[in-house]
């Protein structure tokens, strides 16, 4: 059976829909990212063969989840990142991985400029359903957190007939719990 052995490595808050048949369940809600957790494990496995491409992918995951080392970073985050740099990760190449198309950039700018602030939460909605909407919404949610007085952001967008929400916070508001309700 192809899925007979499942390993879960996660840093998010435990959810009701938890994978129950995991052989190994490594959960660390204080880690910055799953990439940080994988990197820590790899450092302790003598036969670890993290090459430059793997190191770059893991560093990209850390940079993405921490918003370039701004959110949820700790000593372990920087130690994992230093290890990945020693293994050949290139920070400029990682930055290029996150480059946007002009269309995505315009969509993000439109979402941010149309946002409303309510009780410390930025709320933006999109009226279109195409292209890199999910990417633009996630980036807009991140960008809205840089507005003074905003503690959380919610960007609503359509995708395939459904309404999705990209939510972010600086830590004071648990947006995951809000979305679960």
Stretches found by the model and what they are:
Residues 4-6, 25-29, 44-47, 80-81, ...:
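Short, low-complexity, polar/charged sequence segments that are solvent-exposed and flexible
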Residues 5-9, 24-27, 122, 154-156:
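Hydrophobic/aromatic beta-strand patches that form the interior of the parallel beta-sheet core
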Residues 1-15:
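A short, gly/pro- and small-residue-rich
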Residues 11-82:
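Short alpha-helices
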Residues 7-8, 38, 150:
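Hydrophobic aliphatic residue packing
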Residues 59, 64-181:
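Hydrophobic helix-and-loop "lid/oligomerization" segment in the mid-to-C-terminal part
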């Amino acid at each position: 059976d192809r899925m007979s052995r499942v390993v879960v490595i996660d840093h998010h808050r435990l959810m009701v829909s938890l994978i129950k048949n995991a052989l190994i369940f490594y959960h660390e809600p204080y880690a910055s990212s799953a990439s940080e957790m994988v990197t820590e494990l790899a450092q302790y496995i003598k036969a670890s063969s993290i090459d430059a491409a793997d190191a770059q992918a893991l560093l990209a995951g850390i940079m993405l989840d921490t918003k370039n080392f701004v959110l949820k970073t700790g000593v372990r985050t920087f130690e994992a990142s230093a290890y990945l740099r020693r293994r050949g990760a290139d920070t400029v190449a990682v930055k290029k991985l996150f480059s946007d198309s002009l269309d995505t950039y315009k969509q993000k700018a439109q979402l941010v400029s149309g946002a409303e602030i309510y009780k410390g939460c930025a709320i933006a909605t999109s009226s279109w359903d195409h292209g890199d909407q999910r990417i633009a919404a996630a980036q807009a949610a991140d960008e809205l957190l840089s507005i003074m007085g905003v503690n959380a952001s919610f960007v609503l967008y359509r995708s395939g007939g459904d309404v999705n929400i990209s939510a972010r916070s600086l830590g004071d508001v648990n947006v995951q719990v809000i979305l679960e309700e």
